[in-house]
Amino acid sequence: MSNNSFPHEAFDDLLAANAEYQKNFKYSELTGSAAKGLAIVTCMDSRINPLSVIGMKSGDVKILRNAGARVTEDVLRTLVLATYLLNVNRILVMPHTDCKMAENDEADFHKLIDEQYGVNTSSLEFRTSRDQRGSLAIDLNRIR
């Protein structure tokens, strides 16, 4: 296999699950707008199920996820579109406890990735913060 070959078999389970999802799709009545007028910005941590946390269901909310639940330029762009085009009138920024992004600083993550994987990530800003409350205040101010 050449370096440019795509390992399709690595996604067979996902393709099978998607076929089943299509066959049993139960959300065709949803419009794509946020039925409850809410957007959530939260962490990519797979332990978090944002809909369950706030007692909502598919179609109610726009969910944006990234490392550390930070309001980046791309998140802000998406929130603007959701607000003006997709019925969002409330935004919940929802970081969480025990977040890896609050355990280290930028230099630590760059060093770790370089040492363990040989990949130089110094051109990226990970937006780590040991002060989650301070970061939340900054992010809320960006939204305002």
Feature-to-residue mapping (PLM):
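Divalent-metal-activated hydrolytic enzyme cores
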Residues: 1-34, 69-76, 81-86, 101-144
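Glycine/charged-rich beta-loop-alpha catalytic/anionic-binding loops adjacent to active sites
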Residues: 56-67
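Ordered, amphipathic secondary-structure segments that act as subunit-interaction surfaces
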Residues: 86-96
